[in-house]
Design a protein with these regions (language model features):
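Receiver (REC) domain active-site loop signature in two-component systems and cognate sites
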Residues: 55
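Short, conserved "switch-loop" micro-motifs in signal-transduction and mechanochemical regulators
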Residues: 82-83
Protein backbone atom coordinates (compact mmCIF):
# COMPACT_ATOMS: atom_id res chain seq x y z
CA UNK A 1 0.00 0.00 0.00
CA UNK A 2 1.13 3.51 -0.79
CA UNK A 3 0.63 6.30 1.75
CA UNK A 4 0.91 10.09 1.66
CA UNK A 5 2.21 12.13 4.60
CA UNK A 6 1.30 15.83 4.50
CA UNK A 7 2.91 18.25 6.96
CA UNK A 8 4.91 21.45 6.56
CA UNK A 9 7.36 20.22 9.23
CA UNK A 10 10.07 17.90 7.93
CA UNK A 11 10.60 16.57 11.46
CA UNK A 12 6.91 15.68 11.78
CA UNK A 13 6.90 14.05 8.34
CA UNK A 14 9.80 11.86 9.50
CA UNK A 15 7.95 10.98 12.73
CA UNK A 16 4.83 10.02 10.76
CA UNK A 17 6.86 8.00 8.25
CA UNK A 18 8.37 6.16 11.22
CA UNK A 19 4.88 5.43 12.55
CA UNK A 20 3.82 4.14 9.14
CA UNK A 21 6.90 1.92 9.09
CA UNK A 22 5.84 0.48 12.47
CA UNK A 23 2.52 -0.34 10.78
CA UNK A 24 4.44 -2.05 7.93
CA UNK A 25 3.73 0.74 5.43
CA UNK A 26 6.98 1.76 3.77
CA UNK A 27 5.91 3.09 0.35
CA UNK A 28 5.34 6.73 1.34
CA UNK A 29 5.18 10.01 -0.54
CA UNK A 30 5.56 13.36 1.23
CA UNK A 31 3.87 16.71 0.66
CA UNK A 32 4.55 19.95 2.55
CA UNK A 33 1.18 21.64 2.10
CA UNK A 34 -2.43 20.96 1.24
CA UNK A 35 -2.19 22.09 -2.37
CA UNK A 36 0.66 19.67 -3.00
CA UNK A 37 -1.36 16.91 -1.30
CA UNK A 38 -4.33 17.44 -3.61
CA UNK A 39 -2.01 17.42 -6.64
CA UNK A 40 -0.43 14.14 -5.49
CA UNK A 41 -3.85 12.57 -4.80
CA UNK A 42 -5.01 13.53 -8.28
CA UNK A 43 -2.20 11.46 -9.84
CA UNK A 44 -1.60 8.62 -7.38
CA UNK A 45 -3.92 6.06 -5.76
CA UNK A 46 -3.09 6.14 -2.05
CA UNK A 47 -4.32 3.65 0.51
CA UNK A 48 -3.92 6.15 3.34
CA UNK A 49 -3.22 9.85 3.94
CA UNK A 50 -1.90 11.44 7.16
CA UNK A 51 -2.73 15.17 7.03
CA UNK A 52 -1.73 18.15 9.18
CA UNK A 53 -4.25 20.98 9.59
CA UNK A 54 -2.13 24.16 9.68
CA UNK A 55 0.07 24.49 6.61
CA UNK A 56 0.95 27.24 4.14
CA UNK A 57 -0.82 27.60 0.77
CA UNK A 58 -3.77 25.37 1.71
CA UNK A 59 -5.01 24.17 5.09
CA UNK A 60 -5.25 20.45 5.66
CA UNK A 61 -9.03 20.57 6.03
CA UNK A 62 -9.29 22.26 2.62
CA UNK A 63 -7.01 19.59 1.19
CA UNK A 64 -9.30 16.90 2.61
CA UNK A 65 -12.23 18.59 0.86
CA UNK A 66 -10.19 18.83 -2.35
CA UNK A 67 -9.22 15.15 -2.24
CA UNK A 68 -12.82 14.11 -1.58
CA UNK A 69 -13.96 16.37 -4.46
CA UNK A 70 -11.73 14.27 -6.73
CA UNK A 71 -13.83 11.25 -5.75
CA UNK A 72 -11.03 9.71 -3.69
CA UNK A 73 -12.20 7.50 -0.84
CA UNK A 74 -8.97 6.48 0.89
CA UNK A 75 -8.80 6.93 4.67
CA UNK A 76 -7.46 10.33 5.72
CA UNK A 77 -6.27 10.81 9.29
CA UNK A 78 -5.87 14.38 10.48
CA UNK A 79 -2.75 14.68 12.66
CA UNK A 80 -2.75 18.13 14.23
CA UNK A 81 -2.42 20.37 17.26
CA UNK A 82 -6.01 21.58 16.68
CA UNK A 83 -7.56 20.01 19.77
CA UNK A 84 -10.94 21.77 19.96
CA UNK A 85 -13.96 19.49 19.60
CA UNK A 86 -15.36 21.78 16.89
CA UNK A 87 -12.21 21.21 14.81
CA UNK A 88 -12.58 17.44 15.11
CA UNK A 89 -16.21 17.70 14.00
CA UNK A 90 -15.27 20.00 11.10
CA UNK A 91 -12.57 17.58 9.94
CA UNK A 92 -14.90 14.59 10.06
CA UNK A 93 -17.61 16.53 8.18
CA UNK A 94 -15.02 17.48 5.54
CA UNK A 95 -14.23 13.81 4.97
CA UNK A 96 -11.46 12.91 7.40
CA UNK A 97 -11.66 9.32 8.63
CA UNK A 98 -10.07 9.90 12.02
CA UNK A 99 -8.25 12.52 14.07
CA UNK A 100 -5.05 12.41 16.15
CA UNK A 101 -3.95 15.33 18.32
CA UNK A 102 -0.26 16.26 18.50
CA UNK A 103 1.77 15.47 20.47
CA UNK A 104 0.94 11.78 20.38
CA UNK A 105 2.50 8.51 21.44
CA UNK A 106 3.75 6.43 18.48
CA UNK A 107 1.49 3.55 19.53
CA UNK A 108 -1.53 5.88 19.29
CA UNK A 109 -0.96 6.79 15.66
CA UNK A 110 -0.19 3.17 14.74
CA UNK A 111 -3.45 2.13 16.41
CA UNK A 112 -5.42 4.80 14.50
CA UNK A 113 -3.81 3.70 11.23
CA UNK A 114 -4.79 0.09 11.86
CA UNK A 115 -8.29 1.16 12.92
CA UNK A 116 -9.07 3.14 9.75
CA UNK A 117 -7.57 0.49 7.49
CA UNK A 118 -9.61 -2.23 9.19
CA UNK A 119 -12.76 -0.17 8.58
CA UNK A 120 -12.12 -0.18 4.85
CA UNK A 121 -11.04 -3.82 4.80
CA UNK A 122 -7.35 -3.19 4.12
CA UNK A 123 -4.83 -5.39 5.87
CA UNK A 124 -1.24 -4.40 6.52
Amino acid sequence: MKALVVDDSLVMRKVLIGALSRANITDVDQACDGAEAVAFAEKVEYGLVLMDWNMPNMLGIDAVRGIRALGKTMPIIMVTTEAEKSRVIDALKAGASNYVIKPFEPATIVSKIQEVLNKVGTTI
